[in-house]
Amino acid sequence: DSQSSRGIFTIESEQELRDRFAETEAFTNSGDYVLVERYIEGTEFTVDGIVIDGTHHTLAISQKEHYAYNRNIASKLFFTNYNETFDYDLLRKTNDELISGTGIKYAITHSEYKFEDGDYYLIEMAARGGGSRIASDIVPFMSGVDNYQLLINAALGQTPSVEDLHTSDAEKMKERAAVLEFLDIESEGKKISKIEGVEQINAIPEILQLQLEFKEGDIIEKAQDDRSRVGFFIARAESKERIEEIEKEVKNTLKVSFES
């Protein structure tokens, strides 16, 4: 009942449980307890959508990657409208049926799933949009649907309809892609002496945002939870191939130097 993956750990021994228990309990907001779940192996996904008159409509899906040193913290969300490996139509159906069954009338939504042994397992869901500009900028780009405007209209008594979800550019939207990628930089106790490449990256037309949570003189460490990640960039393009090119360009352009 917290947020930002704080207090979440993958436990593989009794000693790890003892070592992590107090920290996990400290992030519980509703009492002196912790939640223990079976660990679900497999690839993780985010799913954003909107509920209109009690029926949920999935609008954007991302496949997640995680830091090698902590598999509970996402390092990248790659958005596409179809996936050659995973059945996104099944994921849409699963998500739509599940959220429609909650009885909520109007809301934007953000859910997370894992795929294991042929099934999608719900990890969490909420009646809010995905953070880091997912709901505000990535979802409309991927779907052609202004989800926030529809929600505002509903709050003002202007009932949205399913027709508002239709777009004349559906075929064009199908090939679109976007990425929210978090930086993986550690200074190993040394202060940052120089940061280069920011202006060049911001000049890339498809870059929506480059956010650095550090400056020259800082000492930065590996992320311990979602909130302690040191920065990110968001890119949107008409194809996943272009997104992959931009990812390489950003990594080759951003240079962070440290004091010797």
Spans of features found by a protein language model:
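A short catalytic or substrate-binding loop motif that flags glycine-/basic-rich loops and adjacent residues
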Residues: D1-S2, Y39-G42, G103-K105, E175, ...
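A short, flexible beta-alpha/helix-coil linker loop
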Residues: D1-S5, G131-S132
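Short, well-ordered beta-strand elements within core beta-sheets of diverse protein domains
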Residues: F9, R38, T80, P140, ...
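A short, polar/proline- and glycine-enriched secondary-structure boundary/capping micro-motif
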Residues: A68-N72, S132-S136, K174, A203, ...
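Internal nucleotide-binding/catalytic subdomain
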Residues: G7-Y120, G129
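Active-site "cap" helix and flanking loop/linker of ATP-utilizing ligase/carboxylase catalytic domains
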Residues: L90-S111, A126-K191
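Peripheral (often C-terminal) accessory segments that flank ATP-dependent C-N-forming ligase machineries
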Residues: I152-S260
